[in-house]
Amino acid sequence: MNQGEYAYFGSSDNQRIQRNAEAIWELIRNDPRFCCHGRAVSLAKGFEENIQLQASLALLQGVGICDSVPSWHIENRRSALEKLGLRVEQMEIFRGGNHTITSARSVVSARNLPEDLELIYIDEDTSKSVLQGIDAFTQYHGASLPMESFLLKPGRRSVCITALDGHGNVVGTSAAGAHFHRNHARCDEAFWGMLATREDRRGQGIALLLGALCMLAMNERHGFDKFFTAVKKGNTPSERLCAKLGLKPNDTSAVIAIDPDFFQ
């Protein structure tokens, strides 16, 4: 358990979800049916037989996420979860193979961070004030961080980077982390994203560069060469950024079951 050593991030509701997720993860982390990169415990794959399991996750955690639900199963799954009293949302999954590393290298070789910005890779020496600044920034931009233990605890396979201006204010972020069990078929694929850029600095390619640098760090430090992310349907800027780094929609979605009572 956390025991105050590591922080939870996001809104008060998100922190409650992360606290619940950490406790659940201690119980089931050796079961490859489940996965987690530090924000919530998920089911690794969606099929008819695990709908009730997803509902149970939602009731225990506040949300129950099922990754990689094929398009033909989404409506049946949504209907079944709604009949259990849960609210349901979905996001499109974008995936990229090892060509993403080639794309990331091309981006990094062609771009530089604006001279007034400082690039920081979050580690155990990062000050609490910087972490708190990143937390507030990502909350404001709807891109919540993984819990601190998944970012900084020894042995965790993750990367979080930020760009700061001359006043120490956060301008952009990106993060990625191991998601699947080591025995899962997709164990070499990391969750990537959590991208955000300050409004007055958009259009300068900062998010693209940070996203590429994050991928390369995950590859160099932890050996990942495949990545996936979840994008809300119609989020054209995110879709375009994904395309530049070699991630494409693959006809699956993340289905999110939400316990409405948790947020009251």
Where are these regions (language model features)?
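Acyl-donor-binding surface of acyltransferase catalytic domains
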Residues: 16, 39-118
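A short, internal acetyl-CoA/4′-phosphopantetheine-binding micro-motif in the GNAT/acyltransferase core
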Residues: 38-49, 193-203, 231-232
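A conserved beta-turn-beta hairpin within the catalytic core of GNAT-like acetyltransferases
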Residues: 30-40, 180-192, 202, 225
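A conserved beta-strand-loop-helix scaffold within acyl/acetyltransferase catalytic domains
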Residues: 141-197
